[in-house]
UniProtKB/Swiss-Prot annotation:
Top-level taxon in the UniProt lineage: Bacteria
Gene: ung
InterPro entries in the record: UDG_fam1, Ura-DNA_Glyclase_AS, Uracil-DNA_glycosylase-like, Uracil-DNA_glycosylase-like_sf
DNA repair is among the record's keywords: yes
Name of the protein in question: Uracil-DNA glycosylase
Amino acid sequence: MQHSAWHALIKEQLPEGYFAKINHFLDEVYASGTIYPPREKVFNAIQTTDLADVKVVILGQDPYHGPRQAQGLSFSVPDDIPAPPSLQNILKELADDIGVKESHDLTSWAQQGVLLLNAGLTVPAGQANAHAGLIWESFTDAIIKVVNEKSDPVVFILWGSYARKKKALISNPQHLIIESAHPSPLSAYRGFFGSKPFSRTNDFLVAKGLEPINWLA
């Protein structure tokens, strides 16, 4: 990340020495037990999607906390791992909205400019949200602020109350915010199903003269 466009702009948004603080945190937690995702994938979202290419942001809360699930991309798991319930519902809504995506690895979305960003970037095995409030929120809020400053239109997809709070960071009138209930089985029937975020995103991108996302790739 040090040599990417992300690095300098994120650094501007953070207190002096924050990157060193993150590295110290990573050294400590990865030495202390099993942490997901693998350390080399912690920054996968901004390593896979260049700032210049970002057209869509899908914000998650924290990584999956089961073995081999987390890839450093929000909601995504490798194809040899069963899709967790929220991802199953995302793919169900996609099927109803546009068509069937056979893979539940979302890397192809990230490669097309969909920033799959979790608010927290690490989690201990079996302990959802255990790293919440420790270090990541300032860093990932900085990423959202950097994307907000893009002159090109971006779609921010905010699912659930946690993600929707991030609207406060999105002030650029060029951008579109699509929000609904979370795809979790606990809330998907309260407005996530039927919200058509994928076709709405593409309609907006096309209207702005941008390439739509191939959500089925």
